Amino acid sequence: MRKLSRCEDGYVKIQGIYIYYKVCKAENEKAKLMTLHGGPGMSHDYLLSLTDLAEKGITVLFYDQFGCGRSEEPEKEKFTIDYGVEEAEAVKKNIFGDDKVFLMGSSYGGALALAYAVKYQAHLKGLIISGGLSSVPLTVKEMQRLIDELPEKYRNAIRKYGEVGDYQNPEYQEAVNYFYHQHLLRSEDWPPEVLKSLEYAEERNVYRTMNGPNEFTITGTIRDWDITDKIGIISVPTLITVGEFDEVTQNVAEVIHSKIDNSQLIVFKACSHLTMWEDRDEYNRILLQFIEKNI
C-alpha cells in the first residue's frame, strides 16, 4: 500500500458552476503540476498514481472537469473543448494564481492540454501529453486499424453490432472488453481508481454527449475536432508519452511530436493507454526527470 501524500480537496466556483479539485502538496516544493483527465467524461481518480510525485517535491493538482466526477454540469451547449480550456485556465488561476505550472493531459486531457497550450503557453513551464491527440479523425482511423487486427470473433462482433448501434449486445460488450484489455489497460485486475473514473463516465452525460458509446466509437460533438495545424506554435518543453499498444496509437503521438519542435517522445514498451498504472514507477520517474530538467 502506497502512502498518499497530504492532499486537500474542495470546490471552486468556475464559470458559474462548482468544480471539484484535489491538491497534493509537496513539503519542499520544486514545481507545480496541473493534471487534465481524459474521457471526455472520466474523473480525476485514475490519475491519482501521480500523487507519488508529491513525495518528490512536485505539488500536484487534480480536478474533475465540467459535468465529470463530483463537479457540476453546465448547459449542454457548453460541452466543448473551448469551454474546457477556459475552465482549466480559471482553475489554474484560482488554485495556483500567476505561478507558471507544468500541465499534464491524459488521453482526451492531452487534446485539452494542447488546446490550452496554443492559447496559454505563457502560463506554462512545460507540457506533458500522455496518450493524447491533436486530431480525433486520425485517432478514430487508428483505432479502426486496431480493431482490424483483433481476433476475427471480436472484430466481427464490433462491426456487426456497431453498424446497427446495438452497443448493449453481450457479444459486442465482450469484444469491447477484449479491446480494452489489449489497448486501454493491460492488467487483469484494474485499480479501483480506474474503475471509479469509468463508473463516473457511465453515470454522467459528458462522455456520451462529447465522445460516444465507447472509446473507439466517437460519434459525439468532438468527432471532427482537429488542432494539428495549430500546435506548431507551442514552444514550451513538451514530453509526449505513448504505450506500445496504446488505443491512441504511436502514429497519433508521432504527429504531435513532428509538429512541436521542442518535444521528446517516449514509448512505453508492453504498455497500452494507462501507462501511469501499467508501469507506475517508471512513468513517474520519466515525468519527474522532465519536470526537474525544465524547472
UniProtKB/Swiss-Prot annotation:
Active site: 107, 246, 273
GO MF assignments: aminopeptidase activity
InterPro entries, per the entry: AB_hydrolase_1, AB_hydrolase_fold, AB_hydrolase_sf, Peptidase_S33, Pro_imino_pep
GO CC term (a single one): membrane
Domain AB hydrolase-1: 35-279
Keywords: Aminopeptidase, Hydrolase, Protease
Enzyme class: hydrolase
Catalytic activity line of the entry: Release of N-terminal proline from a peptide
Disulfide partners: none
Subunit architecture: Part of the tricorn proteolytic complex.
Annotated family: Belongs to the peptidase S33 family.
Function per UniProt: Cleaves H-Pro-AMC as well as a wide spectrum of amino acid substrates and several peptide substrates without a proline at the N-terminus. In conjunction with the three factors F1, F2 and F3, Tricorn degrades oligopeptides in a sequential manner, yielding free amino acids.
Protein name: Proline iminopeptidase
